[in-house]
Amino acid sequence: MNATSAIQKLLDELERLPGIGPKSAQRIAYWILNEDRVDATRLAQAIIEVKDTVHFCSRCFNYAQDELCDICASPKRDQNTICVVSEPRDIPPIERTGTFSGVYHVLGGALSPLEGIGPDDLHIAELLARLNNPSVAEVILATNPNIEGETTASYLARLIKPLGVKVSRLASGLPVGGDLEFADEVTLGRAIEARREL
């Protein structure tokens, strides 16, 4: 696309988004250009607002607008069961299954020696601190079923088992090498229900 500098700047920024290539960036840019100013401003303000008001939950490291995320703050959630995920984006697919009523702990990634990500780079110490609460009965390891996720789950299981807390892993059925955010609700729901103890 032969573009003015302002349009090119928009295209360059859109292409930085995950999954957005040149053609998608061009479609989005044309949509923005063709929308009235009110709609474009509303989009820009929503982006600024989310960057200004959303931070990490002080307990589980999910996204939150208050000190605690909505899940941690809910009296309806089972605080005795903690589901450990790699990233905040892994929570919505699990929530959509309607089969999990516990709380979460977001690690902020997965162990990956090749990328220089070790235990100190993740929220593992905070998870272990949460397990000092004697009411915690089970930890479900819901890291991605890839090499990094399996390595992280094995490492966590070795740390948690001696604490006397039941440790389980999502059952197979999720594709190996896949990511939770792309799993359908039925497959993910069955994986939660058929989780196995480690």
Predicted regions and their residues:
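Long C-terminal interaction/binding lobes of large macromolecular proteins
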Residues: 128-140, 144-198
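Residue-level signal for pocket-adjacent positions within structured domains
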Residues: 27-28, 42, 55, 67, ...
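Extended interfacial segments that mediate partner engagement and assembly in macromolecular machines
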Residues: 25, 74-140
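Cys/His-rich Zn2+-binding cysteine-cluster or related metal-binding knuckle/ribbon modules and their
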Residues: 2-8, 16, 26-91
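Conserved, well-folded catalytic cores of nucleic-acid-processing
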Residues: 13, 17, 35, 50-53, ...
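Conserved phosphate/pyrophosphate-binding and hydrolysis machinery centered on Walker-type P-loop NTPases
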Residues: 18, 37, 50, 62, ...
